[in-house]
């Protein structure tokens, strides 16, 4: 008998991003601080007995078998030896190439949903290790806690930080992470810092100058948002954000922005809404 489950795939913000150097394998050593948003995609799962993995929602420009959702399901199927399959539907709300984790979050939600639906009983560490094979940001979503990240982003230290409201502006661009990290003008020698330093305000996003230069839409969004609040790029962008002490103030600034700018207001959270939902499942 088919079993159904619906779960959120929350957005995240990089509250800062420092690049410490480039490794011999081409990846970059970095430090960043992840916090979740109570806003994201929604995925719907229904088990099937024939072992097939089917995503019924098409994403423009992304082939079915290349979608991280499908890849996550299949890599878990292979690693666990499960003979079960799944039908998946996606309510897509997060932009692609936005720097707020849409694809990685969808993959993490898929891993955790199927761990539950297929009765695998995998622990957090095992799921996170598998998630890392899909992308450096996937483990933070599978673990579901705000975290100070190091290495290529996979070394996570949970943190308890303020949970403000955020106004996130979504420029209509698709930023290529690979292009940003290969840009010759990217800062790659930032000194390592402590979480305390970040919370005191002494931090930045090393990718921001490169993204602003390559994508005028992002630069213009930052200029507009900076009129009202200290604004910053998240990840490699193109989304930019500012923080507020309450929803009313975030909504007030949102209403002042030009109509053509896509944006949303969401609460920051140190425990992802995915994990809050999982805790309610028996």
From Swiss-Prot:
GO biological process, one term: isopentenyl diphosphate biosynthetic process, methylerythritol 4-phosphate pathway
GO molecular function list: 4-(cytidine 5'-diphospho)-2-C-methyl-D-erythritol kinase activity; ATP binding
Pathway: Isoprenoid biosynthesis; isopentenyl diphosphate biosynthesis via DXP pathway; isopentenyl diphosphate from 1-deoxy-D-xylulose 5-phosphate: step 3/6
Leading EC class: transferase
Binding site for ATP: 95-105
EC number annotated for this UniProt entry: 2.7.1.148
Catalysis performed (reactions): 4-CDP-2-C-methyl-D-erythritol + ATP = 4-CDP-2-C-methyl-D-erythritol 2-phosphate + ADP + H(+)
Catalytic residues (positions): 12, 137
Keywords in alphabetical order: ATP-binding, Isoprene biosynthesis, Kinase, Nucleotide-binding, Transferase
Main function: Catalyzes the phosphorylation of the position 2 hydroxy group of 4-diphosphocytidyl-2C-methyl-D-erythritol.
HAMAP family to which the protein is assigned, alphabetical: IspE
Similarity comment text for this entry: Belongs to the GHMP kinase family. IspE subfamily.
Protein name per UniProt: 4-diphosphocytidyl-2-C-methyl-D-erythritol kinase
Organism: Pseudomonas paraeruginosa (strain DSM 24068 / PA7) (Pseudomonas aeruginosa (strain PA7))
Gene that this polypeptide is encoded by: ispE
């Amino acid at each position: 008998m088919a079993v159904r489950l619906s779960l959120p795939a929350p957005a995240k913000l990089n509250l800062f991003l420092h690049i410490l150097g480039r490794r011999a394998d081409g990846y970059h050593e970095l430090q960043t601080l992840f916090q979740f948003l109570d806003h994201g995609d929604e995925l719907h799962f229904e088990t099937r007995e024939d072992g097939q993995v089917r995503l019924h929602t098409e994403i423009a420009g992304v082939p079915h078998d290349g979608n991280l959702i499908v890849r996550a399901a299949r890599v878990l199927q292979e690693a666990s030896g499960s003979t079960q399959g799944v039908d998946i539907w996606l309510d897509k709300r997060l932009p692609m190439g936005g720097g707020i984790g849409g694809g990685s979050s969808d993959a993490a939600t898929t891993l955790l949903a199927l761990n539950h639906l297929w009765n695998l009983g995998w622990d957090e560490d095992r799921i996170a290790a598998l998630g890392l094979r899909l992308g450096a940001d996937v483990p933070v979503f599978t673990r579901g806690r705000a975290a100070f990240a190091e290495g290529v982003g996979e070394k996570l230290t949970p943190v308890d930080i303020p949970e403000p409201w955020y106004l996130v502006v979504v420029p209509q661009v698709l930023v290529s992470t690979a292009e940003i990290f290969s840009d010759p003008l990217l800062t790659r020698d930032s000194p390592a810092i402590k979480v305390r330093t970040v919370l005191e305000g002494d931090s930045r996003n090393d990718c921001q100058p490169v993204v602003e230069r390559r994508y005028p839409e992002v630069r213009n969004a930052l200029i507009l948002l900076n009129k009202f609040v200290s604004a910053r790029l998240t990840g490699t962008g193109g989304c930019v954000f500012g923080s507020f002490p309450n929803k009313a103030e975030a909504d007030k600034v949102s209403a002042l922005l030009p109509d053509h700018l896509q944006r949303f207001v969401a609460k920051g959270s140190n425990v992802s809404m995915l994990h809050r939902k999982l805790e309610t499942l028996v």
